[in-house]
Amino acid sequence: MMPRILLAEDDTSMREYLQRALQRVGYEVDAVACGTEALPFLEPDRYQLLLTDIVMPEMDGIELAQKASEIDPEIKVMFITGFAAVALQSGRTAPEAKMLSKPFHLKDLVMEVDRIFEDAKTEAQFRP
């Protein structure tokens, strides 16, 4: 079974572009426009990855990631943002997460997502 990804990105063209790219390589992707839209989707074990923009209206990606981790401690998080430095210096603790700065190539995104799932598989093998 392919891992499922929840994508939260407020830019419509970017959201559709990322969703299509990840679906093309075989991932199941549900896409929403903001953090508050993502919340009803979050349930334990439903998604293996939250892929979220940091700067979004209503609820930003960091807050969304914190809520997602409370609902499902196993979920992995990757932030996509044009504000990587700002986000990391904001002093708010984000769950252990990967960061991908815009602009990026689709192959970089796919490679990072693949790597997250490879790491997760390795972790699972070593868990008692």
Show the residue positions of the predicted features.
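C-terminal output helix
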Residues: 104-115, 121
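Conserved sequence signature across two-component system core domains
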Residues: 8-9, 32, 50
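Receiver (REC) domain active-site loop signature in two-component systems and cognate sites
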Residues: 56
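Two-component/phosphorelay signaling modules centered on CheY-like receiver
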Residues: 11-30, 97
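Helix N-cap/capping motif at the beta->alpha junctions
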Residues: 31-40, 61
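Active-site residues of response regulator receiver
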Residues: 53
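Short amphipathic alpha-helix used as the core "switch/output" element in two-component signaling
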Residues: 40, 62-74
